[in-house]
Design a protein with these regions (language model features):
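Active-site beta-loop-alpha junctions enriched in small/polar residues
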Residues: 25-27, 53-57, 112-114
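N-terminal amphipathic alpha-helix/helix-capping segment at the start of soluble metabolic enzymes
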Residues: 1-21
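Active-site beta->alpha loop and helix N-cap motifs at the rims of alpha/beta catalytic domains
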Residues: 73-121
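Conserved, mostly hydrophobic/aromatic
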Residues: 23, 42, 120
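Hydrophobic faces of well-ordered beta-strands that scaffold small-molecule active sites
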Residues: 20-24, 50-52, 107-110
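Active-site-adjacent beta->alpha loops and helix N-cap segments on the catalytic face
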Residues: 3, 31-32, 60-65, 89-93, ...
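Glycine-rich, proline-tolerant flexible connector loops at the mouths of alpha/beta enzymes
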Residues: 48-87
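Glycine-rich anion/phosphate-binding loops
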Residues: 27-45, 90-91
Length: 121
């Protein structure tokens, strides 16, 4: 018995070619143009999909860490603000979706908390 599923119309499983996912995560630093460059690199490398990460900072940053000052791409700011700046909103993900469709690559995001599951749903 062959075991396979379809992801975005691509069969994955026994006897199927390897399905390659490029992990973008939060390496875009909250910058859509950088996210698009990372998508382009994944396309150029022959990846089937790109994966982002979605978090609700208030749910994922422990209270004792929120006000700690960190060095960030935006200078010295507290950790909660840093985490907020990394997140894309609904409009941003819409743009990512459109861009991935034009680039013929599947995209999805892993959620880190219940609110992010609802957001992505």
């Amino acid at each position: 018995m062959s075991r396979s599923i379809s992801i975005g119309g691509i069969p994955v499983g026994d006897g199927c070619p390897v399905f390659i996912i490029a992990e973008i995560g939060i390496n875009h630093n909250g910058d859509l143009s950088l996210a698009k460059k990372l998508i382009d690199i994944a396309v150029g490398a022959g990846c089937n999909a790109v994966k982002f990460q979605k978090r609700t900072p208030e749910a994922c940053v422990p209270a004792e860490e929120r006000n700690k000052i960190r060095e960030t791409p935006w200078g010295r700011i507290n950790y909660l603000e840093y985490r907020k700046r990394l997140e894309f909103n609904e409009q941003d993900y819409g743009e990512i979706s459109d861009y991935c469709q034009k680039q013929n690559i599947i995209w999805f995001a892993s959620s880190w908390d219940v609110e992010s599951v609802s957001f992505l749903d």
